[in-house]
Amino acid sequence: LTAKHFVPYFKKNKSGVILNIASTAGVSPRPNLNWYNSSKGWMILASKTMAVELAPFGIRVNVINPVAGETPLLKSFLGEDTPEMRGKFLSTIPLGRFSMPEDIASAALFLCSDSASMITGANLEVEGGRTI
C-alpha cells in the first residue's frame, strides 16, 4: 500500500528504492506456521514482480529476509520460551545467534545506498546461515 503512493513520485524522478521485509520463513518454512510462511513467501514474490515492473523507471525493489530476532514474535517460533527451546532454535542457525536490529539496519542501509545501484529483485537473507 505504501508503494502505491510512492511509485508515482519515484517514476516522475526516474529513481527510487522500495525495500520490503519478509522472513527466512518465506524461503525455508517452519512447521505449524502455514499462514506466516505463506505471507512471507507472497512478499518475496510480490517484490520480485514489482522489481521487474518498476526497473524500467529506475526504481529498485529488494527484500530482506531476517531470521528470528529478539522480538515479541520470537515466542511464536519457540513455543515456550525456555533456555532449552532457545538452544534448539539456535542450533538451526550456523552462526549461533538470533538477529539483532542492527543486523537488519545494516543490510537495509546497503540495499538503499548507491553501492547497491545494480541490485534489484534480490532477497538478502540476514539469517546467520539458517537457509543454507
Which role fits each region the language model picked out?
Residues 28-34, 56-57, 96, 114:
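Active-site loop immediately N-terminal to the catalytic Tyr-X3-Lys motif
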Residues 3, 39, 47:
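Active-site helix of classical SDR
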Residues 56, 68-93:
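A glycine/serine/threonine-rich, flexible loop-to-helix segment
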Residues 23:
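Residue(s) in the substrate-gating loop at a strand-loop-helix junction
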Residues 1, 97-126, 131:
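C-terminal substrate-recognition "lid" of short-chain dehydrogenase/reductases
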Residues 60-70, 112, 125-127:
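Conserved SDR Rossmann-fold cofactor-binding beta-strand/turn motif
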Residues 8, 52-56, 117:
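Alpha-helical segment proximal to the catalytic Tyr-Lys
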Residues 29-37, 49, 77:
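Active-site loop-to-helix junction immediately N-terminal to the catalytic Tyr of the SDR YXXXK motif
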